[in-house]
Amino acid sequence: MSYGTAAGVAALAPRYANAAGRFDENTTPKLAHVTDWLAQVSAMLDVALSGYGVETPVTVAAILPMLAGYANAQVAAMVRGVNGQGRFAEKPTTADEMLLIIGDATAAWVTKNIGGLGALLDVTPVTLATPTVTIGSFTRRDGYSSDGSEYTA
């Protein structure tokens, strides 16, 4: 299930849609690309949400407009980007590079909003595991050995 629609993307990036306000085979990008990108961004949302214990795809009416708006906005940014405009225009960026950037942004967006999303979905978000690095110290046991046995952990 995709969040957002090609019509929603066209509403945010009307310059790149046809005269009827739709993407088709003659627009850049084509409708098929917009549809694929919506599915990919939606999958990114689902993966990020499921990492917090949220059942996906989300079907709760109170949340769907927010997820659709996010997907539409990210795909509209891609539409502008492939046309050399918008936030991806600063340096040449390919569609696959844009998707990687959007993937990172999606994870951050879900992390920022998971408290409210979890409350509306009646889910207690799980805490993601954070790796812990422990740095030890060494104490010299004697001043004369040289085979490495002079240190204890």
Q: Where would I find each of the regions flagged by the language model?
A:
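Internal mixed-charge
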Residues: 36-122
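Conserved short "hinge" loops at termini or chain/domain junctions
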Residues: 1-66, 121-153
